[in-house]
Amino acid sequence: MMSFSVLQVKRLQPELITPAKSTPQETKFLSDIDDQESLRVQIPIIMCYKDNPSLNKNRNPVKAIREALSRALVYYYPLAGRLREGPNRKLVVDCNGEGILFVEASADVTLEQLGDKILPPCPLLEEFLYNFPGSDGIIDCPLLLIQVTCLTCGGFILALRLNHTMCDAFGLLQFLTAIAEMARGAHAPSILPVWERELLFARNPPRITCAHHEYEDVIDHSDGSYTSSNQSNMVQRSFYFGAKEMRVLRKQIPRHLISTCSTFDLITACLWKCRTLALKINPKQAVRVSCTVNARGKHHNVRLPLGYYGNAFAFPAAVSKAEPLCKNPMGYALELVKKAKATMNEEYLRSVADLLVLRGRPQYSSTGSYLIVSDNTRAGFGDVNFGWGQPVFAGPAKALDLVSFYVQHKNNTEDGILVPMCLPSSAMERFQQEFEMITQEPKEDICNNLRSTSQ
């Protein structure tokens, strides 16, 4: 295995990729879901591809993706613009066609040599997604940065950084799919993009009709060691949920929940409990976990057209005092997670938009008592084919301060879910211990044993 301390990535000067044809010069408003403070962040994604001569016939991936990107921007031209801030901090897109920042690079390494180093939290992210000075702002900066790095094995890594106000994971996937289709020879995207951000404007007059614990002010009883501004001792580590881990967790929940809880629910309950224990949060402190819930599709009755690529989700929060969360069996946390997710519907999303306008676009709390989880396992990044087949890995490159992403990962023997966590170093060691204990094979079914002794 090579030493990654001497990994050499050679980059050409960044260039701005503009739409291949003339596009409208106009101003477009973001929705009131899009421009909330919580989404004014950059999200890194990494996608890794093997060489596949039988499919691409020695095509240059940089050239193919660059050309397809320019053609796709004809349809997604707002992404080639720049954000401006209007009255009351309302964000608008100046569709000026300035372009997306694009970097061509090469590295003296193979995918096989990289091994698990491509998985989140990717320790080589700064090499495969270089942060060019002045490019990472929210206002007046490129809305996307894409770096394509060719490897010595013939494979390549596409890493990108997205201004989250422009779209969510499903919107980004729609754009990447359009690029991929054009790289494979399509003349137009199979799904045409729809802007229509006014569909998620606040109502007139705005009215808050639901409880939104995710935006509530928190009285923090902790020692202040974990805040978003205290990054000096923060570390990241990923945790794997395979068949064995899920089997063990399911043995810890009451029978009436087994048939109704999803893998996402169970993982979220596990992480919430382990994290609260690891941080040694004051027993009387209120702790919360928010689940990002996609509003698309028929399930939540939010009427959005096919092709809508804006942010279309909310993150309802489950709330508990730390003491009962830590002391009760897993079923306690699981029921709270399920109830929080069940609150999501069209009325909830519209109430969020109204709250954001009435309260000046508040951000979620930055205290350690809050965790946000986002399920990217069904976003479809693993299906994006630029002409080299499906990626060996594709998804978020790391966790954010209080945000963990669930990503699909296939190890040597099975499909599972990988979850990067961000915690203070001392808490991370305790989290590791709690995780290992809670996912150990039990000698007997605890819940069934409790039921039998109570009869």
Swiss-Prot record:
Keyword Transferase annotated: yes
EC number: 2.3.1.-
GO MF terms held by the record: acyltransferase activity
Keywords for the protein's UniProt record, in alphabetical order: Transferase
Gene Ontology terms describing biological process: alcohol metabolic process; fruit ripening, climacteric
Biological role stated in the UniProt entry: Involved in the biosynthesis of volatile esters which confer ripe apple fruit flavor. Alcohol acyl transferase that can use a wide range of alcohols as substrate to produce esters.
Entry similarity comment: Belongs to the plant acyltransferase family.
Protein's name according to its UniProt entry: Alcohol acyl transferase 1 allele RGb
Gene source species: Malus domestica (Apple)
